């Protein structure tokens, strides 16, 4: 199974669409089963950045795209927009043998992230459910 992981795309004023298009082309040539984007899809969490990012990410020819928010995605009103543009599940089965579990550490308008006690308890319970699978935590 091939999984591609991306992070820190930062669609915004400094974003290089031509460079990201080459990345998309490379990913498509690999034909992975899934793509995981681990935060900072946008730079300021603005609606036009989400729209552009969604349009570009939609060019990736893959069955499953799993996006996790980063601190930049939660800036301004981005925390209200993320789920609209990138709906996600916290438990993602990939094939018969792999599960990818996501944790969110972003907080609105804060640079630092946090995985708290309740999330750690949830993670422990969730991983036990999949004891017979390879587990990836992102």
Report residues per predicted region.
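N-terminal active-site segment of His-dependent metallophosphoesterases
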Residues: 1-56
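Extended active-site neighborhood of metal-dependent phosphoesterases/phosphodiesterases
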Residues: 47-134
């Amino acid at each position: 199974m091939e999984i591609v992981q991306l992070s820190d795309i930062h669609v915004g004023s400094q974003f290089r669409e031509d460079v990201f298009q080459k990345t998309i082309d490379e990913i498509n040539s690999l034909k992975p089963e899934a793509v995981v984007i681990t935060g900072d899809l946008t730079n300021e969490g603005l609606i036009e950045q989400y729209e552009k990012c969604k349009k570009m990410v939609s060019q990736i020819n893959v069955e499953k795209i799993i996006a996790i928010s980063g601190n930049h995605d939660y800036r301004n009103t981005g925390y209200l927009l993320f789920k609209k543009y990138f709906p996600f599940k916290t438990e993602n089965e990939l094939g018969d043998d792999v599960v990818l579990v996501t944790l969110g550490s972003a907080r609105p308008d804060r640079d630092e992230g946090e995985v708290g006690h309740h999330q750690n308890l949830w993670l422990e319970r969730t991983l036990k459910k999949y004891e017979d699978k390879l587990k990836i935590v992102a």
